[in-house]
């Protein structure tokens, strides 16, 4: 009888010519399939044996009468993960056992032997083994013995934590893919071209740039050549320090593709600080490499996924695990995934192994998380065969941290002639004017036909904008929804091109990745990196003389928001004795000062300490860190604005049409506000909240009084309580 006994992993209903039947996936087929895939994925970092065993044993707990009853007769829920974890534990490979235990519920905190039975840690849950809570395995299911060398957990280790998360990623992606193959048949995955093909396309585009005529284009060509020749160097950690306007987007792509092909690497990943930069870079890459080879993955992207009608979007599928030749994503998405514990977020991690990863605008990494960010970069290079390129015009000083987290890799500069290029690309003259009253500032701005003024706070930006004449004046800040900002930017570009008056007052959002070109820029005193980013919007194409392209640095009479305090302090020290703001040496001094002022606060929540020493008596606090590590403090709330097309999307939301795609589209019509501003709007009766609309959570609302959203300046701060809200 035992010979006929069948154990199933999954079932799926099939309708053939109106006749309903059920198809079954054998448990042994599923475990074998997952084992094979997981082995393949883990091979990228030499962990193929562990990958295979994790896959072959992850669903052992389905070989129980209780689980089969659940699957076939809709019986009660059953813990099917602990049994496989227990089997892996027999080889004393406890962290791999934790991967198996968390393959649905997330990688748990490891805990300690003192944890009571049933605690939500690995050690607490494994104690349930042998109690009635965990059904006994059916002796008729042939479970293969675990063949693994011992890997006991004796002490905490940061590198082991990264390795565990990588193995977890291999397991959950393999599990998703094998299950998907059974449930839905073959899906359009891995559809991009080879990196060799992409390199050929890039070469064809670059050949059009041969024989440059202008001085600037000759310099860009030299930088490009330096990138191509450096690509033959070994894998490791590189910096690419190129002045603004030096063509770093294309040059870094040339390095990445040449390097990846040279070393047989799997993909290229771009990590950028803002979604606004992503959209721009992604357009450049798509133009060169073809739309199907470029995956954008961030909160603002929408996929056309028509899976109900059997037409899954290959890009939506690729976004689940980054199985694409070129991925472009945000620093938030990237680093939060590196410290995540949920299967959906960790799925993609194994595809970072053996990849070229470009960190664009590397100076934008938040200082309070600098250490865990560099630790993640170090681990990818040191343990997982990746190459990292820190790419910026203002290189932060990271040597000491790189040495700590990637001790066998020294940083190497791709384009070593740094001072020479910075001199050649000098397109502006800096002028420091001290304190300016807002009225005096407005007068100065009015004296220019075309000028950009960047202010630290959203409130001050609105106030200064209100002092300018209506004709030809524009305002940009994050109090305007993204779709609105895009419309205004198009108007600004048109007026600049047509030589019409165009005065813009903006917050710092224009500093990175917005390619507008002004003859004059005013920048309120801020971090030196911000000032240089602002300067990059002045005489961008070098069509005017540097001495006629003035970047004016000023202070306002009102104190800057506290957020800017340390950066301004470091800038004051770095610019002492009339130092040249644009020289790489001044920049280095600035980052040294900033690190000094910040002291030990470069790991705000103690991520490194938690994995090197344990936390709260628990070794390997995967879940605790995942829940607490946020690149951007979410002390803001979302207000959806019924502006233009946003109104129809909000109607759909209120009618209950909730879907991922709808929330993504709504992101284009949302403003983030601080709690006090949210409360003031609520008190003024201007918000519809979760109490009235099920589709909202307690951190979001809909603006129902459109008189508070201005066509020029966005969401009004009039309802506020006098506090500075800054963006």
Protein language model features and the residues they cover:
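C-terminal helicase lobe and adjacent C-terminal extensions/tails of nucleic-acid helicase motors
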Residues: 96, 381, 439-446, 454, ...
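Accessory nucleic-acid engagement/destabilization modules that flank
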Residues: 2-205
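Conserved helicase motor
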Residues: 10-15, 275, 296-309, 456-459, ...
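Conserved Walker A/P-loop ATP-binding site and its immediately adjacent core
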Residues: 256, 265-289, 301, 397
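Walker A/P-loop
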Residues: 234-256
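Interdomain hinge/linker at the junction between the two RecA-like core domains of SF2 helicases
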Residues: 387, 393-446
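SF2 helicase catalytic motif II
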Residues: 327, 331-335, 343-383, 388
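Inter-Walker segment of RecA-like/P-loop motor cores
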Residues: 290-339
